[in-house]
Amino acid sequence: TEVLVDQPGDARIWARGGNYKASFGTEGARFVPFFGSQAPRNFPLHFTLASIEAGDTALLIDSSAPAELDGMRITYARGPVLERYDLAFEQVEQSFVIDTSGLSGNLMLRLVVDTELQGQFDEQGIVFSNEHGSVSYSQAFVVEDSGDRLPLQTTLDGSTIEIQVPADAVEASNGKLVIDPIINISSLPTQGFELLNPDTASGVEGERCYVVESIYSQTDHDVLGYRLSENDIVISSVSIDFTDMDWRMPKVAYNRNSQRWLAVAQAQPTAGKYEIYGRQFTMGAQGMLFPQFSLTPSAGNHYNPTLGGDLNPEAGTQYAMVCEYVCDTCPTTCTMKGVFVSGTGSIVGPGFTWCPNLPSGSRYVRPALSKTNGIAPIASRYWGLAYELSSGLLFSDTDLYFRRIPYGGPGGESPLTIDGGSGYTTNASVSSPAGSGADSGRVLVSYTYTPTFAGNATIRGALVKIGDPASTLTMQVLDTQDLIDLVGATTANQQGSSTTDSDGADFVVAWSETNTSTSSNFIGISTVTTIGDKLAPAGGTSSAYFGTNERPTGVSALAKYSASGAPIPSRMYSVAAEADDANSVGIAEALLYAPGYFTYFCSPGTGATLPCPCGNAPSSQSRGCNNSSNTGGGSLSGSGSLELDSISLSASFLRPNATAIFLQGDVAVPAGVTFGDGMRCAGGQLLRLAVRTTSSGGQSTYPVAGEDSIRIRANSLGAPIPAGAKRVYQVYYRDPLSSGCAATFNITSAVQVQW
């Protein structure tokens, strides 16, 4: 219910009320009524004070006076007259304060209105209208010293409003005459603002920002921003753009060093010219908006931006923006451009432009950058970028490629092929880098795959290694899988667009799904982890289906930091979605908390794990190899809280009254290696955490009340567990009877804990 006022840097003052926007510059006042999001375009009214005459005297008016802002009032000081606009939520009150010293006779004020709307009289004054809506210009009044309002003759002559003040009112004005008409929307559209293409990014300590495209008309889209707390409460809002420039497909990212957000969008500053515009802002108690600027002022057209930020605290960090690029006048065919922006909003360096030698009609399209570039040292810090190669032909195959983007651009490094087979690959999304130690520098690429001729669309995922602090590792694809089974999607349904991010440990995937029986759409959200170099479902996954006829457009992991300032996994994700109903389009948002710490694997003969060494297969999934007591194989599970440091491990289905050792490894070996009568999937540095004797029921738990926690025990053994690290646990135990196997010990299935 408040009027928004902005000075975006175009030498005009802008205001937006509940049903109008207006701009004020040296060219005069421009009023743009809201006729509904489905209006084909804007229908503005441009007001220009043309003349004021008193008797035979014409007042000298300064037609180039600048607009001045004071609270909710805009004033033009035009010599002997002040032209004023008082801004209210549903109307604008125009007034003219005229110095009448020495004037006599009737006074005539002429105001030219440049508009496509048709003007006509009604009982209230003048109405400008078309089939989409109407704007009223009320009969003007003179405000007398007593406060009484004297109606004035207000007429329309062609495109000129004429307001006549009788001579006696001029004489009685005591040197100052106030003429006061009101501009407002006299018939509201039946629908409100439609919202499209929301995006989300995270700042620090759980705060997050949404940006969304607001449709003012079919040729004028605005961009709004909202700041939400960790508790899902809207803290503040900001209007990133509500000028008459068309802004579409907004993206948002955060720079921790400057503590500024950057929003970018595909904009059209002039007819037929598309550029990527950006604007920085802060959203604290003393929020600030910085001037709008073009990231791509060069020749050619620029479309479909994607944006990455940097959550590292040191100086010199940047944002990265990549967009589609079409330059028909350039000597070579260019298809993509990258721009780097400093934390304070300056373009850094030349960026990069890709002008590949592609077959005629083929283009790189739909780029997708990761939200952040990880926590590696700056020399080995990368954003992940996925993009499609399209032939431009309908129903043709598309291929999906990947590059890593360091500061300054990718240089001559060759791209990776993520999916180069037959079929249609689209809607790619790239997570922020995840992992620690040897597992660091990994990103998840999620995308939609549709068979060329028949079959349901599905979501696929690729785990890509883009580097780590200890090496200059070349990029490599570690694993590719259909994500349906990992995230719990329904195979018989159609999966559509997906989006992904990482909190530095695991990944989250949000996707749209269409029920093939009812044609209803919904959104699924789930977490995915890694076991070694393989993608795996995350234990304790949270799945959320919120609403129908929606598609996810953005997901962002909430950033969390330890007392020392080091990042720690938050297990919290912010999801933005576009919602469509029978009448309008809007947005939905959700905050997902993914509580799963445990991932279960290493059941021999299932998944990636090799079969048992001597035909002693487990009786069911989640068991280790069968033992001589024929329990079906030992199983291991986890429980407790990371926050309370109360994680405990419980083994069951072991041999009764047997010696058992709780084992920790810092590397997962998904295939397993033969270990006694079973398969060991815990690798790397192995620690014996505890020795136990199983119960008569073949059970054992570690730790129990009074014992050090697993984290404290590992630290005492010289192997501290950093936040975000993964450790693998198994229990091996005495199994001396033969049962067809030569060894005298066996081992449970494995549980991976995300610390």
Provide a role label for each language-model segment:
Residues 1-184:
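Residues that cap or anchor secondary-structure elements
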Residues 1-7, 11-14, 18-24, 182-595:
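Extracellular, repeat-based ectodomains that mediate carbohydrate processing or recognition
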Residues 74, 94, 107-111, 152, ...:
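Hydrophobic residues positioned within well-ordered beta-strands of beta-sheet architectures
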Residues 101, 169-170, 312, 713-722:
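Short, surface-exposed loop/turn segments at beta-strand-coil junctions that are enriched for proline
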Residues 120-124, 397, 459, 657, ...:
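Short coil-to-beta strand junction motifs in C2/discoidin
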